[in-house]
């Protein structure tokens, strides 16, 4: 998984910074439970983000996006919100390529957003479940390239490899948040034991990402 992230998404994470679970939805939800802070959701987002936050009694704001920006959150919009926010800690949930809009953030857009997130010490949940599905570019960028220290990356088998029934997801912590590994491990051990063995074998084949498989996916 570490090699896959490095080669295909430009994300440098060691194996001990990566967790595997029964789907990225589960790992996202566990992260929502662990982090205390005010959540920021760009308008036009996956259906489960807000219900997950509500289920823990968390607070959130939905930031407007516009057609002229291809329904993507802009750095100016994020800066304007954070500069007036009364909350001390924030978690931004980004999804690119996006469900439901299909929009994909560019390197330039991510670099601008990263600068704002760094300024305000925002934690980013980067949902990259569709990372290899991009019909416009050779790859979909990751905000972790520009803001590694504050970005937790999520992904999984279901979308990229057309394997919705194979429940396996991953999340990767930056080294700056590696101290949370103990917290995650404790929560994971009390909520799920492991991913089923047959699915793990399928994932091993998928994440080796042969040229034949890459052609099929791309």
PLM feature spans:
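A short helix->loop->beta-strand "cap" motif at the edges of active sites that frequently abuts
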Residues: 58, 119-122, 149
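Conserved core segment of the aminotransferase class I/II
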Residues: 145, 150-218
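Active-site phosphate-binding strand-loop segment of PLP-dependent enzymes
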Residues: 67-138
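Conserved PLP-anchoring active-site segment centered on the Schiff-base-forming lysine
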Residues: 34-53
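Conserved beta-loop-alpha segment that forms the PLP phosphate-binding cup at the N-terminus of a helix
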Residues: 14-38, 167-169
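Hydrophobic residues in well-ordered beta-strands that form the structural core
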Residues: 41, 62, 124-126
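Conserved N-terminal alpha-helix of the aminotransferase class I/II PLP-enzyme fold
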Residues: 1-21
